Structure formats: C-alpha cells, structure tokens
Amino acid sequence: MIQITIDVILEDPTLCVVQLYTQVSSQTVFALLSDGSLAVLYPNDNNALVLASKTSMANQLPVDILRKVITTDEGQVQVPITALACHPFVENLVVVGFKDASFSIWFPTDSDPSYKTELHQEELCLIKWLSHGRILVTCDVSGQVILYKFSTDTYSFESITKTRKSGHVVDIVERTCCTDNIIYSIDQEHSDHPIDVSNYAGVGLCEFIVMWSKGDVAVLTDNGVIRHIGTVNLSAGHALLYKLYYWSCSDTCCAISTSGDMFLFGFKTLAVGAYKDILAKYKIEYKRENGIVQLPATKIAYMAPSDGQLRVLSLLTQEVAYIDLEDHIENFVGVNGGLAVIRDYGILIPLRGKNGYAVVSCHRSTGSCDSNGNEGMHILAASDHYLHANDMRFARVQDSNGPSSGPRIRPGSDEFIVTEQHFLHAENPRCSYANIYMSQIVVGDNSFSQTMITNYSITNRNVVSNKMLPIFHDEGGKPINLPPGFSPETASTPEGVDDATIDSFSAEIISSRGKFVSLLLFSFEPKDMQVAYANNTNSAIMAQDLTGEGLTHMKFLDQKFTDSRNSFISAVLIGARIIKVSVNTNANLLQEHTLEIKHPIKKISILTNPLTSVSSDNLSGFVLAFGDNVFTVFEVAIGKVPHLAGSFKLDERYTYVADCVLYGRYILASQNSRADLESDYLKVEIVKYSITGSKAGSLVLSDDPTHGATVERIARMTLVNQHLFMINNNLSLFYTDCKTFNSVVKITDIGQLMFNTNIYCAYLEEEDLDDIHLSTPDTGSPAVEAEESPQRQTREEKIKDLLLVENTMQINQQLHDRIKQERKEQNVISVYTTLPTLIPLDTICVQSCNATITLDNAHHVLFTVVFKGYNVVTGLPCLLPYVVALSIDTKILGEMISAGLTATPSQPTEKVGSRPTTGSDGGSAVLKSRIFDMAPYTVTNAIPDCFGNIGLELVLSTSLNLLFVGSSMLFALKTGTFTKRALSSKNLSAYLSWLDSKEKGSQRNADLVFQQEKYEDQISLLQSIYISSEQRAKVPLLVQSLAETTISMNDRIKGSWLDFNDKIFLSIQGVFAPYVNSKLETLMQPLSSTMLTLLSPAFVFSERSGKSEKPRTSNFVSINSDRLTIKNLTALGSSKKTGFQQSCTATYALNKFTICSSNGQLAEAYSHVLVSENLHVWRSLATLCIQNGYVDLLKTCTTHLKSPILSLLMRLVTNRKRSDAADTGQDQLKTKLAPQDELLLALLSIALGASAQGLDRLQGKPLLLSGVMNDIGLSIRYLMSDGAHSSLQQTGGLTSLAKKSSILSLANRLIHLNDLESSKICYSEVYKAPVAAQGEIDSLNANPQQLLQQNESVQFLNDEYKKKGVAACLTLAKKGTDPQFLYVAARMIESEAKSRDVKSDIPGKMKDELDQQTLWLEAARLYKRCSAFTHALACALKCEDDELIYNIGTTSQSQRLSLVAATYFSNKYKSGLITISEKGRDNVSEDFCDELQATIEHALVLYKSAGLGAQSLELCIKSNRMKELSNLLADILSEPSKSLDRELDDDVVLQEQSTTTQGTGDVLQGISSDLLLRAGRALLDVSPEDYSLNDYNSFIRTAVIALAKASAYQDALQAILDGKIQISERIADILTPASIEHDEEAVRVTETLGKLLHKAGLYQSAVKKFILAQNHTLAINSLIKQGDPMKVIKFANMARQKQVYIAASNFLQTLDWRSNPTYMKAIISFYEKANSLENIAKFFANCAAEEISEYHDYVKAKQAIIEAMNRQKVAIDYVEQNASSKESEKVATARAAKVASLKKTLQAYEQNGKLIHAFLQLCDFARDTSQAHDSSETLTTNSSKLLTAVRKMENCYVKPGDIMGLLAEFHGVRGEKARIVSIIKDMCNEGIDPENYLAADLYAAHAAEAGLTVVNKALELEDIDLTAEKSDH
C-alpha cells in the first residue's frame, strides 16, 4: 500500500537534494544537498519534509544543518560531504564522511562534532553499517577499506583492520549465510540467558565481501583476516566493476562491470574462511542509463539496449525472462532514469514522457504444496493447551494428510507482467517538473516498511554545482556512480523536457524551486490499528438471547443474523491522513468514501449503529480516526456523504493515549496522565469522552484498592457490546462493564499462561518413540471406537491415545514413571521451543487483540491476542509466532465485578469441554485457553468470528525464519533442520546430538583432527562465549557441521527457490475443538494484502497486488489500488460462490461437521447436520462430501435433498456392477473409491452445479460415461415429460447431460446402419469443444475414431477388396470420410501399386484394371485426405503428378516435405534447361517453356516454405529471374518492396538493422553475406529498359538493403551517387554500419552518408551521422544550416571541441543576440571554452560599435570596449608566454607577426576607448555647465578637437553626428537658435543626416530655417495600433 507522499521543501532555492537517507527506527530523513552540506528533515503538520528545527522535533533535533568549515589561506572554506550512513536502530545516529578524508559520528544534537582525520588520506566514498550495527566500515577513493568495532552503549569505535586494492571501493556486503549460523545457533544453545550481541562483533565470526573497481574481490573477517577471492578479468576498453550483489539464501555473490561482464562466485562450505567456488563467467548486454537491480532468488533485472524490453536473468541457471513494455503500456516511449525494486512487490520502471512509473511484478510458478494446497501447513497436537502449526519436533501429526517429508519444490519459469501504473499529479502548485527519476530505494527491516525516494527533474535552468559526491568515470569518461539526472558538472535539465514545457512555467515558480524530491512510502508493516471493521453480529446475538429463543434457530440464523453479518463498515488507511471507508449492505450495495483527516492517523475504530435496520439498506455508524492526541469522528450512512460528527484534541503535555475505541456516541480512551510537567505519567485510567470532547466519566486503574499502582499502561483494548477487555504492558487481561463503568476486574495473566512450563505437557523421548515407532500409512486415522476393549489396542493406538487430551492427567503420571527426571525439562513442550533468546521475555508485549461473542452461548466471548517483542540483534521490534485464544464467560465476570473478585484461569490440565462451576468463590471466568504456535510464521493479526473460528494473518520471510529456526536457509536445508515453511523434527540440538553419537560410534580419523586444527581459533572463540561445559562440548560439532556442509550448484538453486517472502491468511476452524485437532485452511496472498476480518465461510481483506489483464492506474496524490475482496473457505462452501450467499445455518452446521470429521468423530459430526431440515445445509454438505470423497455420507445427503433427479442418478449408478477394489471393511472416509463411485461423485457434482470438479473426475473416461449416459438418458427425458422440468433446471448440468445422452444413442444406431457421415456428426456434437461457461460437459478426451473402429466398416472394406478387387475398394474409399478408414484404403491401393510390374505382360483378365500410375495417384490422394502427407508425397512422386506434389508441399506445413518437393521441381527445371540447350530455343515449343516457368515458380515457393531462402536466391540468380529475386529477397529482409508506391519506411527493417539482436540472425540464418552481395549486385545491374519504372525502383531499394546486410556499403553508396535512388533518412539508417568504433572504413561510410544527407537538405539526419562518426565540425555545420539556435547551443555543450565552439559562436552572432541574453551568454561562454581570446575581444569590440551606431549608447559602448581591451591583452600575453626557445625560426617569426597584429588591434581598441571616453566627458561637461556664460566656447573648442581626432582615425566608433548633435542640444538648452541652425547646415554639408542625431522636437523647430523641408507624418487609419483596445474586451 502506498501510504504517504512527502515533498522536500528547502528554504534556499539555489540548493537541491542530491541523495536522501531514511532510518527504520525513526521518521528522520537525512538529505545531502548540492553544496555539500547535510540537512536533517522531519515531516511537519502538512506532511512535508522541512528542517527539523521547524517541527515538533525541534527539542530533540536542534541542529538541522551540518556543514564542516575550515580556515585556509583563502579564508573559510566549506568541506563537502561525500558519504553517509544511518545506524540501523540507534535513532538519529549517522556517520558522515567528508571530502578532506575525515569523518564524524554525529547526532543532530551536536552543533560542534569532532572529526576523525588521521585514518584516511583521500576523500571518503562509502560508509556502511554491518553486523546489525556493530561493525562500521569506511572506504575512500584510493581503495582503502577500514573496519571498526562499534559500541552501541558508548557510541565509541576501535579500528580492527585496514586494506587497500587498486581502484575505488565499489561496495562491501556481509556474508550473512555463514555468520547467521553462528549467532543464531549460539542463541539456541543459550537457554535462559539473554544474548549479548556485542560479544560476537570483532572476534572473527563475521565475513564481508569487498569489491574494487579495477577488478579485485576480497573477503574481510571482522578480526582482521583478509582472504583474496580473485581478480575479475574485465573486457578490453573502459570497463570497471560497479555492482556487487549477494544472496544469502544461496550464498552466492555476483560482480558486474560497466560493460556487462558477470563474475558469479560462492563458497564451497558454510564455514567462516571457506574457499571460493567460481560458478560462472559470462557477459550481458544492458542499457547503462537504466542500471541493474537485484531481485530475490539470485536474479537481476535490467533493460535491454533497445530500451523497450525488461530482462530478468537467473544467474545460476542463466535463464532469461523477457517482458516487452510496449506490449503492456500504451504509447510507451522509453525508460527514464534508473530502475528500482521493492522486494516481493515489484520492479519500478520510470516512464519517459509520462510523469509516472510502471510496476512489473512476478507471478511465481513454483512452491511447495500439499494435496490440499495448504502450503505444508498442518496442525500438530502437542497438548490440549499448546498446538503447533509447523513444528514437527515433539508432536505427532493428527492431520490425515501426514507431515511433509521435505520441501517438494516444482521448478518452473516465473512470469513477469506489468501489474500497475502510477502517474504524477500535475496540479501541484508549489513546484513544476517534467520527468521522474528514481534515485534510491531504502528498504526497511523485514520488508515491513519500504521507502521509494523519487527524484523529479527540474525546470530550473540555473547552474547548480554538484560539490559533494565523488564521481568515478570509466576509461571512456562516462560517470558510473552518479544519481540519475546529474551530469558531472551541473544538475542540468534532463532529456525529455521540451522548450514549450519550460516556457509555460512562470518565472516565480522557476526561481522558487530547485530540484524537487518526493518520497513515496510503500508500507507493508502490520496494520492492526490502521484497518477497522464492524458489523452488528454481536448486538444481534445479544438481542436474540434476550428474547429467550435459541441462537442456532434457523429463523434467526438465516434472517437477522445473516443480515447483520452481510452488512458491514470497513476502513483502511491508504495515506497518512486518508481513510478509505467501505459500507456494504445485505443487498450487496457497496458504497465507498475517501476521508481526508487533518492530522496523522495512529488508530481507526468503527462502530455500527445497532438500531439501523440492515434489511432496509440504511446501515449507519461512526468512524473514529485518532492520531497526535486528536480524535476525529465521522458519521457514515448508506446513501449519504460522510459528515464530521465531532473533533477534539487532548493536551499531549499532560496526557498520553495508548488506544481508543468507540462505544455508542462515546470514545473510550486508554490514557496515562500527570498533574504537572515535572511529574511522571503515573495515573492509568480509561476515560469516556463524548464525540464532541466533553468528559463523561473516568475509570482509574492505578488507584484501584485491589491492585494499587501495579497496573501498567493499558496497551490495547477491544469492545464487545458493553464488555471492554483491556491488556496492559505486562500482558495482564482486565475487564470492565461499560454500562456501569465503575470497577475493573483482572481476568488472567496471559504472560504466565504462555511462559509457565508447569502447565505444559511433557512427552516421550525420541529414542523411546523410535523403539515403538510404527510406519503404517494411516498415521492420521481417527481414534479407536469407545466400545473396543483396551486389551485389543495396538501399540500405535496406545501411543496415539497417549497423545489425546482426554488422558492428559494420565499421560503426565506415566511420563513421570518412564522418563528420567533430569531429561524431563528437555522434553517439555512450550513456547520456549520456538522463542529464541534474541527476544528477551521482558520485551514481549501485545501487538493486537480482538474479541467476539460466539453462537454457542451469548455470554461466551472468544478472545484472541498476538504479540511482538524486541530483537536484541537488529535493535528493532519484531512480531512473534504465537496466538493465545481464550473463551471467557461474561456472566461470571459480571458476578465478579459485583462481588469485587478477580477471575482466575482454568487449569489447562482439566478435560477440555468440561464446564467450570460457579460458586461462592467466584468460579473461573476463563473457560478454555489454547496457544497456537505458528513458527516460523509470525502473526500480524488474529480475528475471531461468531462461529468459533479464528482468521490469522501470517507473514513468512527468509529473514524472519532465522529468528525461530536457528540457522541459515542453506544450512537448514542441507541438514534437514527445517523446510522454509515448517520446523523439522530434527532440530539443531538434535542434529548436533546425532552427529556426536555418530562420531563416538566410529573412530575419529585424521580428517576430523585436521578439521579441528584448521578451525581451532574459531572453536576457542566460540567456547569462550559459551557458559556451560555441555555447551562448550558441542562447539566442535557445530563448527564441524558448518565446515563439512559443502554447497553444490543444485543446493544453491534449491535455496534460491525459497528466497521470497509470502503472506498467508489462515483459518483455524474449531479453536477449542474437543478432539485437539483444529482444521486449517490457508489462502496465499501477496505481501501488500491486509486482512479485515473472517466472516465464515469467507475472508474479507483489502487486496492490492494481483495479476490482471489491464494494469491498474492511479494518481500520486491519491494512490489507491486497494480493493475489497471476499474469498471463500472451501471447507465450508463452494469456492465458486461468494461466502455471503451461503446461509448462516449451513455455515454453522458445516463448521461443526468439519471440526468433528477432521478428528474422526463422524457420529458427532453427523449429529450436527441431522437436526437441520435446511436444504442449504444438505446441499453444501453434499458438495463437501464430493470434495473429500465421502460416498456413503453423500448418499445420505441426496436422500435429505429429496430430489428425484439425484435419486435416479444414485440408483442407476449404484446398480451397475461394483468393482472388487472396494474394501467395505475400512472406514468410509478412507475407503479407496471404486470406479462407479468416482462416476457417481462426478455426476452429482455436475448436478449440484460444481461442474468443474465433476469434469475433472470424468477426464479420460469417455466410454464409461457413455454407458451411463445411455442408461439415464431416457429416464431423464421421462421425468421432463412428467413435469419435472423445473427440478431438472435446478440440477445444473443435467439438462445438457440428457441432451447428449440422446445424441449418443442416435450415433450408435447410425453406426449399425452404416451411415458413417451422420454418425460422425453426432459424435462431434457430443465431444465438441469446451463450453464450460454454460456448464456443459466438456473436455472428455474422447476419440470418435476409437468408437468407429469398433464397427464393421473397416472389415467391410477388406471384404470388398478381396471379393471385387482394388477398383471396388477405391470406389468405396472415395465415399469415406473417416481418417482411419481412408488410411486403410490408401494402404491397400499403395500395396496394389507396388505389386504391379508395368514391364510384364498383363493377362487378359487384367486389361480393364487400373494401371500403376493411376493407383499411385489415387493412393496419394487418399493419403492426403487423411493427412498422411509423407505417404502421400511418396506416392505422388511415383506418379510424377506436379500439381499434387506442389499441393502437398505447400499444405503439409512440414519443412522436410516442402524441401523434398522443391528438390523435385528444381531437378525438373535443370533437366528442362538441358533440353533447351540441346535442342535450341527455337526448336522448343511454347507450352514447354510455359511449363518450365511454372516449374521454377513452384520450386521457389517450396524452398521458401521449407525455410531455405538461400536456395531460392541461388535459383533466381542462376535463372536470371530478377522480379522473383527481388520479391524473395524483400520477404527475407522483411522489406515491403511488393508495395510499389510505398516509401522505405518499414519499422521492422529499421529495428533489425539498428540493433544486433538475435532475431536478425534468425531471419538471415543460412544466407551468407556473399549470397546477399551477389543478389544485390544482380539487382543493381538490371537495365531499366527491360522493366517498368516501379519494378526497377523496387529492385534498387531491395538491392540497397541487401548490400547493407552484406556490409557492402560502398556498392550501396555508389548506387546513391549514380542517382539510381535518392538518399533519405530511412535509407541512411539502413546503410549505417552496425559497429563504428575502431573501424575507419565504417567511419568513412557514415561520414559519406552524412554529407549526402546534408547535400539533400536533411540536416537533422546529417547531424546524427556526423555525431556517430565523431566528426563534430561537420555536425555543427549541418545544425547551423538547420537554423535552430537552441540545438546549436546544446550540441556545442555536448561536443566540447574548439572548432565547434567557434562555429557556434559565429552563428549566434548572426542572430539577434542583443534581445536574447541566452545567445550572448553562449557566445562568450563558447569563446572562453575554445580559448579563442582574440574572438572574444573582437566580439566585445563589435558590441561597442553596435551600441554606438544603433543605439547611441556610449556608456555601454565604453564598458564593452574596456572588456575588449582586457581580453585582447590576455590574448597577447597568452601568445607571448607560449614562446619556447626550442621553436624554429619560422615559428618564431610567425609568432612575432601574430603578436604585432594583436598589439595593433589593441592599439585601435585603446584609441577608440579614449575617444569614447572623451565624448562622454563632453556630455558630462555640457550637462553640468549648460548655463555657464563661458561654457559655450569651451565646449565648441573641445568638440572641434574631438571631431578632428575622430576624422583622422580609421574605423572610429565615435560618430561625428553624435558630437555635432551634442552641440546642438547644448545650444538648444541655452536658446541659441542661430548656432543650432548653423550646426544643422554644417551636418548637411558633411553628408550627415541631422534627423538621425537630433531630438525630434529640436529638429522640427529649426530645420526650416536651415533650408530643410520638414515632413508632417499624418497618422493614417491603417497605422492605428489596436492592441491596446483588445485588453478592454
């Protein structure tokens, strides 16, 4: 379930997030920023990630920015962060590595952290926590690796070892397969002493695999031992190692290089220090941009180079699964960024241009399933008090299926399919983004909580430097470790963002946001408080009990109770603040609402209104959402929109709320309170609030006079009607009545119930059981009948009787007598057998609890509780495998509350089922108790239902197995300790004891002594950790078992099959079954499903993942693919129907029947259904009997159903002859079914509507079915004629059965009448294709020919042949249609043809018979009719019938036969050519030539049918048949040349040409390059005069493609140069060589193609070819010709070549660069990058000139000319400084000339600068002294001097008109008109237009006086600008 979308908000818009790190143990997020600093982020009230100091965590996380600043000579400099690692469980502890080789262990409370600087000399590139946070490793870019031992108590560390190899460190992984064996095995032997994990760190029990980029791989042990694995031989070129993956379940490691080299290795044994085992070396082709991701089961996933295919490679078997994304995703363009994976959820693929991603999930075809499909789940009765579901160590299997001997794995290929698509919400007002990049996946512990971090590309074009991550390049210069979207220099806009998208965003948005990162949390954690479900069943039972009528009365169960059960309200948390509420009524009216809460949600509670009438579909209720001490209540009702009923908040400073439930219109809250902020939360109370927040009452527990302050905080509560059950942190169970709400009573101590071993039962020792072990197959047979005498019991029955709980007291006494006292404790069965000491007892607390009233008694409550604990190794909470179920009498509790007593639990040694008595002592409120142990499964939730069943949600993962097994997966599988889903009878302790006895029984040899010497250090280490001497003695055995457990390839493959997590919904039917054995039924579900409730006979759950035809799509803002799903328990009803359709009466009866029958108590089982007259009960029971093969009970059910059809079927089938195989002496449930019983079950299942099961039984028995159908056909039709048609309609498939029996009878009669054609039609009607949808009988696998062979048709044919000869036989055969009949006739005729000798004399009596050729022909035709094509072709060749041979060759669909026929025609054609050459063409008839042409055409077609294209081409070339050659060649190359008017645009051809895939090799298989070359040249040599224009053009196109396939590029290019075909983009792509690298000829061809495209005006295509040929100069020229400036800029940035930079700058200067700052920046930047300093100076000089000539802006001109002078000086210095004393005289002379030229240009720039400066000084003087009396003369004099200087200088930038205009303006201010007129005249005399240099008003006022005409420009109508008017409308 995708829960939350979190945005990262940074205050500084120039910063962007480069990488994020999350921590499982906290909600803190650490973000590495682009400036090299670390930000500490935390979700705020709006669920956005902001700096922690701005949230409620400000006190705990006061320092939210970490920057290391050092002082240098240049001042203060920030040192960027280059690596970071969060501790696995210590909250907010991180290790930060810096670029200066230092690192720091830092808490966000430390504002001045200390730095370790002496350990590394180069910048850190990798930091990791290993060994569950006890080992720290730091790596730097020089290849140095340092291991440290870390103390989680003092937060200190000490160095263990260091090593260094060539290249940087790619990764380091822990070899958990061997190290887990040590830790978890020691844990199993530690008894009651808690484990201290710190003892195991740094002593040599852990191994780590390290990989360096240059190819070295080594293993480090945590005590400093270094073991070199090897050096990976990388491909030549620029390949580096960049991925290291490890799989614990198969102990396999894989190193992958950048070029796809795979190095797969493992270890020969499971011991520490084992030798390497190289498994495989091979190479893959993948797309680097998308990366490689690790999958379970030793698999990896990557994108193929074509970008449209996802490949999943199994490394051990080298099998590849493909999925073409374009087949599943509409408008698929490509993959955008790196792949990501979430374990057991799917592969996440970001989609280019779609703003979203797709999920590819795996549907496994492997698994271990028993006969019931229950995945190996069995109930094992250890006692009446303690039951195992998977533990086979001490208990005997009571289930009839028997224990699983081992994991029955069926290997198969997994199927990968696109299951979901999600798209980004495009209306986020705070940011703008284009495409998604997935930069990280952070996986939480045990797969419960997984976070996907997605990095969205920016639209901001600001340059953001990436200062922090160390960047590693391969030898080709490509970065191999950057996050997607980052280039080495900048975080620029990634591909796929077009200009229109960028332009559409406002400047404010672009400037306010940098890179944008979002977190999507995939939460698979236990959701016991995040889902809720409620209906009115409990209130209905209470109301029925008040009436005094029975609870099991049919009227109540099928009406009121059914209505209450089928109407419900459910709620599921789908986001941090979003709840999906579903309201379902009895009429299947489903209404869904999405509620958005303003605060985070911790708990959901639902209460339905019992006063609403569910039958009228007006169900209503309340939904409570609690979180952050805020209570929000919504009222929901069917047909109405939910509305807010109330909301209030408690002050978290004084109140802590642990749990809450709804009670009517009140809220009951379990809270701890305190009076002031200085005190502790001492007050424990249950407070009753109204939904609006007013306090209505309080029940204080800590002030209770009985218990005092011993009551701990109430952790969980559950409410049943008015009964409130509460569990505190000490696992004590309390009760109160909410009506009175004035006192509380303690019911029992659940912790004592679980951990007190005195109440468990002890059993026989293993050796004693082995002495009397009986291996009869009937291990699960029921108990002996009561009437049998004890003396007649067998030994097995005695043992079995000991295991039954009726004799529990007697068992204990016998065991005390038989078993030694010192061994008793070892054989006690309790939760200690599966609870590891990794979980201390004092950390176990309640996970969830639920309760409901049962239908057996309205005062009996079925209560369940599941647990969680603290794992001291991982430092995190974990679920436990136990469920405690209690049956509690609320009536007794009420009496005890009145009397002020405490409830006491009943002793489990009492006989189950005996009712406790109530007396003056208060009696016992706990009637029954039972503990279920599901190890190695862990329990998420346990929900009881009113029928006395429990639904469990179980999770099993490979990591969780270790907690409850004590060994790694491979070791357990090899030694038989356990199989993935079940603990074995030979556990680790038993295995070591067996190994010890085996060694003692044999003399110790030298090998064992050698083993001990080799592992002496490891043995001594382990013995120092152990406590007792007995444990120390087992250490050598343990080490020996690990060292001798060799691992083969098959072992690794077997282990990888089990490498996946799964979830099971398990129903326990009969929680307190009186015969020990409960009935289990499992439902496998994906990890993302959540159980809502169990409503027998159906599970109700929220399901997300699943295989579907069309992927589900959703939106990131409200991602909600979850759907409400209902699935049936097959033991209680049909799997085809929804469980709610079954009546509750039937469910109740079948539930009791199932429990009793599974324990062998058939009499009691039958009594539960006998009292019922409900036809639903008997019908469902009949279906159940059919499923289990209960034939005798099925007959009873049919009697109670009172159906004449079923009675008729029963009578007809049972009257048939019974088989001798039936053994009437056995129990009816275990009797082997006779054939007629199988038939009866099949027919009755069809009659009852379960047609699928019936048809399965009928498979392969069509003849037996035919006889029964004949028998019952007439009877059924008789019943229909008698008016029983309505009852027949109710029997489902029998209507079809009657029809088919009639047709079958008719078919049999037609056979005897020799009407073969009609009988065949009848048989086809009976045995037609499946029509399962209509319930008809299908797939009977009957062969009509088998029935036809039984008649006399074949014999009749033989008689005709013998009597009348072959002619009569042939006449008869021509009328036949049956293949078998035709085949026999053809054999007869063929035999007759073989016996004829045409050369011998034919007797007179035979002259009228058929000749041999005719017989061969007729035999061939008959063989062809019966599809015997091989015989037909042989006969046709005998008679040389061309048409028949051609027909057989083309229709047989056999390549072999097509080849034979083609050879025949080819030989015939060659013979014809010889005949023509001998006789001459003029002497050959025209018909002969036409026949020869037909022969060659036949041969060509047949060669093609045979898949031999090469022979066809050879034949066409030799026969000079160009048109056929072109067509054949086009078909082979998939070229549509037959379409005369179509362009060369076939995508298949282009795809095959552009990618060297295997498919191309398949198409051209068998056709050599030489043949393609000859064929292409032959087509090119065709004269255009001999063929039409269309044909000729088709020849040329096909020839070009063929030549390209043959790599004859020069010939193909010559055809283009000769003008035979025009160049196009498609043709250019075809002619482009597949591999250009290191191939000069290929480069020349590619360049030639580019030039041809350039010449043809196809500039974009030419650019592609030039880039491919690495000729960037030609590429930029084509781009310039295309005229797109943005493309020119992008290409220049990409090419990074001097000539390209200069060409781009020159082109941009031809554009309007002044109005587009981007162009100007690019021009300057390109010149700088090209180091073209002279051009930069020239550009600035041109800027200065243009500023003056166009805009008269001398201020900007001055700035530009100054910049030009500075650049010119730099250019001069650069040329002078590069001079060398060794250079030649010619070079020195050229350099001197260059310097002189540059200095001359500089002199011109300086002179222009001086003149511009002088003019500006004149302007300043004129402005400042305009009113001074003597200023006029001064200004005139200076202006004259300046004009003289300007006129003397060539190419002067200063314009004389500007100087004279300045004088005119000056005199105009002073009012001196005469001088103005004089200046205007002077300007005219010098050819200067005064209008361009004077102000318009000044010129207009004085022009006339100067003799100039002033034109009055009247405003014409068409010149009026209307743009201003438009805005008004």
UniProtKB/Swiss-Prot annotation:
Residues 774-795 are annotated as: Disordered. Component of the intraflagellar transport complex A (IFT-A) involved in flagellar assembly. LRR repeats lie at residues 957-980, 1019-1044, 1510-1532. One of its GO terms (cellular component) is ciliary basal body. It comes from Giardia intestinalis (strain ATCC 50803 / WB clone C6). This is Intraflagellar transport protein 140. It is found in: Cell projection, Cilium, Flagellum; Cytoplasm, Cytoskeleton, Flagellum axoneme; Cytoplasm, Cytoskeleton, Flagellum basal body. InterPro entries: TPR_IF140/IFT172/WDR19, TPR_IF140_C, WD40/YVTN_repeat-like_dom_sf, WD40_repeat_dom_sf. Keywords: Cell projection, Cilium, Cilium biogenesis/degradation, Cytoplasm, Cytoskeleton, Flagellum, Leucine-rich repeat, Repeat, WD repeat. WD repeats lie at residues 76-116, 119-158.
